[in-house]
A protein has these predicted regions:
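Glycine-rich ThDP/TPP pyrophosphate-binding loop and its adjacent helix/strand module
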Residues: 1, 212-411, 417-418, 607-718
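Conserved acidic/glycine
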Residues: 1-133, 138, 143, 153, ...
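A short glycine/serine-rich beta->alpha loop
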Residues: 116-125, 166-168, 210-219, 470-472, ...
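Cofactor-binding active-site loop characterized by glycine-rich and histidine/acidic residues
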Residues: 118-267, 285-303, 596-598, 605
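Thiamine diphosphate
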Residues: 134, 211-279, 309-327, 497, ...
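Acidic-glycine-rich active-site phosphate/pyrophosphate-binding loop
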Residues: 189-207, 295-296, 505-518, 667-676
Length: 718
């Protein structure tokens, strides 16, 4: 094949695209011809069960052609970069460097606090890695979105999850130096305030969700996994939205990052992972993190394209992101961009001396000096500045821009110094939408050391019970939950999604059959068998405005999702005021022939976490009411379902008891329609007594009631 004919000496966009198509087409034909002429009948030979050599090579060929096409598109975007692009990058990189310098000074010197001490906050500089700003210029940005905007509610741009040191990426999306400073010090102007004005920063990391910047977390893979969940939501909601998840080579070793990439590859999600090789994690070199030849190889196992770029070249960041976005929104799926770079500073401000060494020689610093010198010579600020001068930008224009950025950061620092510190008691605000946190003083004030005198307004008289069991016509515990799931799906329509393992056939214990019978099969999504990313995906869907209902099949398996529940879902509201309307159903409990790992009773794991709402209904009526009500809350809710109560043994519990009830579905739905709370967060007296109070939940409600009836025969009323 001949692909070059009367080609122009230089290409423009249309001619380059036409040439690329001809080149890829010729390459495709050539590879096919080579396979057929060289291997012939061997192509039909089975090389692994149910897969022929021809099919194996065909898939390799398809991947190779995708790689070639993406490479040519990167060339096109790279060559389309203008001086205007480069001036914006230089300005943003200068802003980042100025801000980093100021934050380091604040950390070193501290800012005076009301008690007379000094506090410098914390922070992570991006020295030599400022080229990340160019990612944003390839995205759909809305830097002027209002402060109360959220994705789908005033902000309709792309989303980014920066690493903790990617301050420049946040600035390029629309974050401001003052917001970054306020977040680093936790002052009242911080947008990491749990949604409470003047509460100050609860998280000294940065973020600006109103312009699409997801605040990072200390367990670093959480951000990538959550962004994967947001990409999952965009896929479900048919949104024209792209997602960027940044991670370092150290954090890329984590299981949750691999789980996230695996989900993205399995579902073809619109996301790119930017994996930055910093040459060292905190203190651990890359060779002790992974055996890959290049970090881009990590995408191979997940089945999507990856490539490597030089992190000191802003145009490479821009072109790579532009191609990843183009590919994803055309339906190509995820990509991974491996960035070779180096941080020219310690992991955090306090780490500089250990990393680089103190001028005194103690400590000497442990970083390799040859490596340091190599990357110092590639510092993007001076090298890219020199390129701009070569391209005709005047020194006067560059110096004016640099003076403007320096002045803007100085102005922000002045405003920071005038900003108030938060009042300590505000730290308790906004733990969930139902309640604030208690202080130790609150606990002491409630304690009197005396039994409560008998009340004349007790809801039930001694021996009187609040409910009864139905011998005929009642619902089992399982049926009540199934009906609630179907009613939630009907109520929320396309915003509702049910995710977990084995969901599309029937779900654990066949609980999804009612959804299928009610016409909601399209809302059931099978997920890879990895509980952490199932929960993270639910969090991302919730942040995107959906109403996800997550299933973890057994109580013991919730341990695999513990980080996702406790360090992600539970903290979102308290950290930065985000709604996370996600319900997580977890079957658990003994007397079910389940054994270890399945029957674990896990309420104590989560009930002590202030950001989670934990429900453990004991009756069909409570199961219906609480699941319906919990699914309306803007908080992460755990619905703990004792398997022994399901009624799997002919409608009886695991210990042979009938607990079926005639369930009233109207009352709770009326309360929901009126915006009123009903049962969630409240106790209920189910038997009146005078001698002792038993507080219990779940399956133990029935056993406690039996015990009370037995003791009543001895004259003891509970």
């Amino acid at each position: 094949d001949h692909i070059i004919g009367a080609e122009p000496e230089t290409f423009e966009g249309p001619s380059w695209n036409a040439f690329s198509d001809r080149f890829i087409g010729a390459l495709d034909r050539g590879l096919k011809k080579q396979m057929e002429s060289t291997l012939g009948d061997e192509l039909d030979r089975e090389v692994i069960p149910r897969r022929s050599l021809g099919l194996m090579l065909e898939r390799r060929r398809a991947h190779f052609l995708v790689d070639m096409r993406l490479m040519m598109r990167r060339l096109a975007h790279y060559m389309a970069v203008t001086v205007g692009h480069r001036m914006e990058w230089q300005r943003l990189m200068t802003r980042t460097r100025c801000l980093d310098t100021s934050l380091k000074e604040i950390f070193t010197e501290g800012v005076e606090t009301p008690d007379g001490s000094r506090f410098g906050g914390k922070g992570f500089r991006s020295t030599w890695q400022e080229g990340v700003v160019a990612v944003a210029t390839a995205l759909n940005r809305q830097p002027d979105a209002p402060r109360d905007a959220r994705p789908g509610q005033g902000y309709d741009g792309d989303l980014v999850a920066p690493m903790i040191r990617d301050i420049g990426l946040g600035l390029a999306m629309g974050d401001t130096p003052l917001d970054v400073m306020a977040a680093n010090l936790g002052k009242v102007g911080s947008n990491q305030n749990g949604g409470w004005d003047d509460a100050g920063g609860r998280d000294l990391h940065v973020g600006a969700w109103h312009v699409g910047v997801l605040p990072p977390t200390a367990p670093l893979p959480i951000a990538s996994a959550t962004m994967t969940g947001l990409a999952f939501a965009a896929w479900r909601q048919s949104l024209e939205r792209f997602h960027v998840a940044c991670i370092g080579e150290g954090a890329s070793s984590s299981g949750e990052f691999w789980e996230a990439m695996n989900l993205a590859g399995a579902r073809g999600l619109p996301i790119t992972y930017i994996l930055q090789n910093n040459q060292i994690a905190l203190d651990t070199p890359p060779a002790k993190q992974s055996g890959v030849e290049v970090w881009a190889d990590k995408a191979n196992a997940m089945g999507f394209p990856a490539w490597t770029i030089d992190g000191s070249d802003p145009a490479a960041w821009h072109a790579s992101t532009a191609v990843a976005r183009e590919f994803a929104l055309e339906g190509g799926g995820p990509t991974l961009i491996h960035v070779e770079t180096m941080r020219g500073c310690g992991h955090a401000h306090h780490h500089d001396d250990l990393y680089l060494g103190n001028p005194s020689g103690t400590p000497a610093g442990y970083v390799d000096r040859d490596l340091l010198d190599y990357w110092a010579a590639k510092d993007p600020l001076p090298t890219h500045r020199a390129l701009l001068v070569e391209m005709g930008v005047s020194e006067a224009d560059l110096e004016l821009m640099e003076a403007e950025e320096t002045a803007a950061v100085e102005e922000a620092q002045t405003a920071l110094n005038e900003m108030e510190w938060p009042e300590p008691e505000t730290v308790t605000k906004g733990v969930t939408s139902l309640h604030d946190a208690d202080t130790h003083l609150d606990h002491f004030e409630r304690y009197t050391g005396q039994s409560r005198p008998e009340a004349n307004d007790a809801p039930l008289k001694a021996g009187e019970t609040a409910w009864s069991y139905a011998e005929k016509g009642g619902w089992t515990y399982a049926r009540a939950i199934q009906q609630a799931m179907a009613d939630v799906a009907t109520m929320h329509g396309d915003d509702c999604v049910f995710i977990g393992e084995d969901m599309e056939v029937a779900g654990a214990f066949g609980m999804n059959m009612a959804l299928k019978n009610a016409g909601h099969t399209d809302k059931l999504i099978d997920m890879p068998l990895c509980e952490a990313v199932i929960v993270h995906a639910g969090v991302g869907a919730a942040l995107s405005g959906m109403k996800p209902m997550v299933e973890i099949q057994f109580g013991g398996f919730a341990a695999l999702g513990f980080n996702a529940l406790v360090n992600n879902a539970a903290m979102l509201r308290w950290r930065w005021g985000a709604d996370c309307p996600m319900t997580v159903r977890i079957p658990l409990g003994a007397r079910t022939r389940s054994g270890p790992f399945h029957a674990n009773m896990i309420e104590s794991w989560f009930a002590n976490d202030p950001g989670l709402i934990v429900m453990a209904p004991g009756t069909p009526q409570d199961a219906y009411d609480l699941l319906m009500e919990g699914a309306q809350l803007p908080d992460p809710v755990l619905m703990l379902e004792h398997i022994g109560l399901y009624g799997l043994r002919g409608g009886l519990t695991g210990w042979g008891m009938n607990i079926n009830q005639k369930v009233d579905t109207q009352t709770v739905n009326d309360r929901i329609a009126n915006g009123e709370r009903y049962k969630v967060g409240r106790a209920e007296v189910i038997r009146g007594g005078t001698d002792l109070t038993l507080i219990t939940w779940g399956a133990m409600v029935h056993l406690a009631l039996q015990a009370a009836e037995n003791l009543a025969e001895e004259g003891i009323e509970i």
